[in-house]
A protein has these predicted regions:
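Metal-cofactor-binding active-site regions of metalloenzymes
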Residues: 1-213
């Protein structure tokens, strides 16, 4: 039986395999829309565990950060919000996500997660509720001890040449300035205009925000 995912994943002909491995695989990536924090890029954050990478959560300033596509998977499967953006322990939050993931076979999220596990962590299995513990331990060991698994390290491993962060019009771009002045950062990081707060007139705080703008 063919493996669920191997190096020829989605490459269904010899021509596709040749074109990808010979030309496309090593091409630099220009990511014009991402949610990586410029502060975390500059400070080269090291994540403590895979839940922090994948699920994010409530930040010290009260804001939320994380992959809302993964949150949607959990919500669609009836996971209580306290495990998604709440204060439950990261291990429990990851368990809930792992249990929900098999329910979205056919959704790109299922493939994205397994591609990431293979590329960055060398995990060849399938993530579900039963394998969550071994995946948790494997990923956390690499995140905590491998110097290539910091924010900058992951970007460099992915051969990213350009990152466009999503920024509010009133951001002072202080972290972008620091990044530009740091010669150790070899890839380009630039802000992009995302005025969500200026058009969400129905949300609390709109008037105060417009005053700042």
């Amino acid at each position: 039986m063919k493996a669920f995912m191997d190096k020829e994943f989605m490459l269904q002909s010899p021509v596709a395999q040749h074109l990808y491995h010979t030309y496309a695989a090593d091409m630099p990536i220009c990511d014009y829309h991402c949610h990586i924090s410029p502060k975390e890029i500059y400070e080269n954050r090291r994540f403590e565990n895979i839940a922090q990478v994948w699920l994010g959560g409530r930040q010290p300033d009260g804001s939320l950060a994380g992959d809302h596509y993964k949150w949607r998977v959990m919500r669609s499967n009836g996971v209580p919000e306290e495990y998604i953006t709440g204060t439950k322990p990261d291990r429990e939050r990851f368990q809930k996500f792992a249990e929900a993931l098999p329910m979205c076979v056919g959704n790109p999220m299922y493939h994205w997660c397994h591609l990431e596990l293979r590329k960055f962590f060398g995990y060849q299995g399938v993530l579900n509720g039963d394998t969550a513990e071994e995946v948790w331990n494997l990923c956390n060991d690499k995140l905590q001890h491998d110097d290539s698994m910091t924010v900058r390290g992951l970007i460099e491993q992915s051969n990213v040449a350009f990152i466009g962060t999503t920024d509010d019009p009133i951001d002072d771009l202080a972290w972008h300035k620091k990044i530009k002045e740091d010669p150790s950062i070899k890839f380009t990081v630039a802000p992009s205009f995302r005025p969500d707060k200026a058009i969400n007139i129905q949300k609390p705080g709109f008037v105060e925000y417009m005053g700042k703008l």
